[in-house]
Amino acid sequence: MSDMMTCMPFGQLMDWVLQEKKGQDTVFGVHRPYTADPKNDMTIFTRNLETPVGPAAGPHTQLAQNIIASYYAGARFFELKTVQKMDGAELSACVNKPCILADDEGYNCEWSTELTVPDAMGEYIKAWFILHVIAKEFGLGAQDGFQFNISVGYDLAGIKGDKVNTFIDGMMEAKDTVIFQECRKWLLDNADKFQNFTREDIEAIPSNVCNSATISTLHGCPPQEIESIANYLLTEKHLNTFVKCNPTLLGYDFARKTMDEMGYDYMVFGDFHFRDDLQYEDAVPMLTRLMKLSEGLGLEFGVKITNTFPVDVTRNELPSEEMYMSGKALFPLSISLAAKLSAEFAGKLRISYSGGADYYNIDKIVGCGIWPVTMATTLLKTGGYQRFTQVADKVEGICPKKWERIDVDALKKLAADAITDGHHVKNIKPVPNRKSTKEVPLLDCFYAPCSEGCPIHQDIPQYVALTGEGKYKEALEVILEKNALPFITGTLCAHNCMTKCTRNFYEESVNIRGTKLTAAEHGYEQLIGEIKAGEPNGKKVAVIGGGPAGIAAAYFLAREGAAVTIFEKEEKAGGVIRYVIPGFRIGDDAIDKDISFIQKMGVEIRTNTEITSVADLKAQGYDAVILAIGAGKPGTLKLEKGETVNALKFLRDFKANDGKLNIGKNVVVIGGGNTAMDTARAAKRTEGVEHVYLVYRRTKRYMPAAEDELLEVLEEGVEFKELLSPVSLDGGRLLCKKMKLGQMDASGRAGVTETADVVEVPADTVIVAVGEKIDTDFYTANQIAVDERGKAKVNDKTLETSVSGVYVAGDGARGAATIVEGIRDAQLAVKDILGKEITRDAAVTGDVKDCFEKKGILKHSKEAKTEEERCLTCNKVCENCVDVCPNRANISIKVPGMAMNQVIHVDYMCNECGNCKSFCPYASAPYKDKFTLFANEKDMADSKNDGFVVLDKENKTCKVRFVGQITDCKADDPADKLYDGLKKLICAVIDDYGYLITK
């Protein structure tokens, strides 16, 4: 496929807007319009402005449809994508693709517009007309309630050249341009298509599109050049002017220190740009002169803060050597520069702001007197343009009618607070891979990432919704269908579902684990009386081990009518959860409630009973035996000198003795997993202990433990000793070799190398939490084949061992695993024993419209009454790729005969920025992998995408590429061999979405 975009004719754009609004009540995929209240209007550059927010010069202001979508959602100030003398194919060839990565902080390697400069002007003027139309036609606001601001660069010679100069003049006065006349004529010729927009309104559309400019210069541009451009725009063009400043004005030391403190120490940047860019001591007098000049001319002048921040590509983020950082990591730098300049000029220097602005800081920025504010990175995330609606709502009434000055003290506080603000600080752990291992299908690609990420594929959106509605019993029924341990998993689950949750791209995951526990706690008494075993099926099964996997196996067996006996060597069932996991993490009551489900179904639990022979059980008439014996062989770490304590033994002793152990004042825990975190927290609570040190050979960022576990350990005062490798214990001191982080491996984890430096850590006791192993003696004693690592050889789909009718589940199958993985193992074994499916999916209910009401709305758990308010119900609607595409090149369409909307990719609108790949939950890139509509056969030939080009709309003849084969197709012919679902999709495009087809 080509990364060259094709501009749509004005008539096609206008038809698209009107027909989509009429048919779907959306505009370019934006569902909820923002309607401006005139009482909140303000004035800038002598013109009216309804909201002080809009899209920054970048991907969201390149094409007309981007600007229209922004306006519909609530934007009113449009900083148009930069134009310069290099443009079109020449510029596009210099931009490596994909060029955007925005799954956390943002990065890009793009420049100015990839259109030709004349085409860019055409897009802006088409958008100018359409905004005037929809403001009146759809009742969104005043026709003069928005403003366009041109962004020009990169040097004075280029700006004075015919290409850019013609652009500037055309945007200042467009009445004689061909595109202005075309747009005006189309509206007059089609005036009967409008209900509210009149011929008089058409005649009144002003031709002076903009009266302001933002100067964008390349890094290293001399101050004299910047000032000469500003002088030219002010004196020759009489444009209100902003000069874009770079974060490099803060100096290298400030930027490096700030990024390191905030967790962005992995960002690599040198001091070159800080030395080469505009220097602060040059900037202040230059800005002083320009302020005086503009005042004398009766124009407004200010700075645009800030440009993006150049960093090196070191982890294959983008196909470039250098990229530009934006978003949450840029905010503390940009707002600090704003504070510095504002203090310098006593609040009299006007600032147009961009640099990590989003819903959570927009009111504070505007409240300081900084506006307009433009955005990019937040719009690149799920919710997309719809995020503007919440942003516009939040700033209503904050701005004065006319700008006065900046509140310097408030701005200083905002800058100081940004350094520790959780919305901008980097998480301790690296951003996890949130993608599935599956490739996106051409049709029906919606699915819930949480359910997919759960080893037992729980129906999470369904029980979250039921819990939110207060239907706790029904929610617990949904949970118990697939999860036998709602109390235990509601407390301790490793919650991969939450890692995969799309809500992470908004602010934080839906609290799925907590919701499960809420449903269990509130639904238990209503449901426990109804729990009973299934009709007897004649099967008799023994389960060895009463831990999570064993309890789960017994639950599913008994529910389906099998007679089940659990053999547990301890005094009570519960396994590691009861005897090892500390009581401050889970109480016995929660464990007992989960066990009560199997007790209600008549499962026999024989405690204090250790089984050594599987053959003996079979001789007693058991049809099958499930081994859920755990992985209890201690992991070891041999020191050159001194003894260590195994973590599981310590935790067992801690729990058995209520923390009354003699382990000294200084305790070292070696390890970085969840068991190490439990051990450190328990040691902190042990009688007589004063200091607990957690020693790990890498840094916190690379510890296997979950982030929430790490945070709890930090909050409780455990001292982290990073980059240390233990050597020996002698005289109350643990000697460690200092380690050094090396290159990243393919998984993104840093390697480590040993240095000659030695570090001492006070240590009366050293506890080792470095992984438990499977005790293979039981397997070999029972003639069960094991592999070279001592694990039982099993059928991966059934977990049956080499001994017929004997299965392995839980930690004893694969080594230390999660609780929910143990439940999955139990399901696999039970399914094979019974020869049938044992779980059923919950029904998907509710109105799809409710899903779209939540899109684009940022809301933390603490801000919501229930998690149902935040759950995006991805099992009904995903459309992440539709949300995040700046160009609207991924389209959701209704196909007759299909339950859910389908997504197609529109080739001629795409520039291969790659943003949709980051947010698609599949291991795919929608711009490459979704069924694609091409404008013509040439475009199709230039692409490898499966897709189609419409040859004749009337006869529905197309050329189609499917699984790489190109054929001619008549979409409405039942005899045509093309897959029926794709024929339906093509027919829907032709019949109901004809505006997508270019003429």
For each of these PLM feature ranges, what is it?
Residues Q458-G468, L476, F505, S509-R513, ...:
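Beta1-alpha1 glycine-rich phosphate/pyrophosphate-binding loop at the start
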Residues A809-E837:
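A conserved FAD-binding loop/helix module that cradles the flavin
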Residues A519-E535, K593-S613, P634-E687, D787-K797, ...:
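Glycine-rich dinucleotide-binding loop and its adjacent helix/turn
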Residues G642-K665, M744-A816:
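FAD-site-proximal beta/loop scaffold in flavoenzymes
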Residues R76-M86, P247, K364-V391:
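Glycine-rich phosphate-binding active-site loops on the catalytic face of alpha/beta enzymes
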Residues A448-E469, G490-A520, T565, K572, ...:
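Iron-sulfur cluster-binding cysteine motifs and their immediate structural context
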Residues A89-N108, L380-E404:
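C-terminal helical cap(s) of enzyme catalytic domains, especially alpha/beta-barrels
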Residues K22-P38, T248-G347, T382-P400, K641-G642:
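Glycine/Thr-rich beta-alpha phosphate-binding loop at enzyme active sites
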